[in-house]
Every structure is written in structure tokens, then in C-alpha cells.
Amino acid sequence: IICAPEGGPCVAGIGCCAGLRCSGAKLGLAGSCQ
């Protein structure tokens, strides 16, 4: 599994690298890792 770096796409807290959290994700829309 490849993780997303800061600023990368994510969905509901899934997909970010360690230490990052998903910001701005809404139902059906991807957020960005912060």
C-alpha cells in the first residue's frame, strides 16, 4: 500500500502517510493530507 505525502489525496482518514491526517474530506470527495 502506498501512502500519500503531505498535500496528497486521501479519503476519510485513509491513505495518508504516518503522522499525517486527512483534512477537508467530505462525503464522496477526497481531502488532502496535512
Swiss-Prot record:
Tell me, in one coarse class, where this protein mainly resides.
Answer: secreted
Q: Where in the cell is it found?
A: Secreted
Which tissues is this chain's protein expressed in? Expressed by the venom gland.
Disulfide pairings: 3-17, 10-22, 16-33
Instruction: Provide the Gene Ontology terms for cellular component.
Output: extracellular region
Taxonomic superkingdom: Eukaryota
Query: Its Gene Ontology molecular function terms?
Result: toxin activity
Give the UniProt keywords, A-Z: Disulfide bond, Knottin, Secreted, Toxin
> Function of this protein?
Intracisternal injection paralyzes mice.
* Domain writeup: The presence of a 'disulfide through disulfide knot' structurally defines this protein as a knottin.
Instruction: Indicate the family of this protein.
Output: Belongs to the neurotoxin 14 (magi-1) family. 05 (ICK-7) subfamily.
Protein's name in the database: U4-theraphotoxin-Hs1a
What organism does the UniProt record list as the source?
Cyriopagopus schmidti (Chinese bird spider)
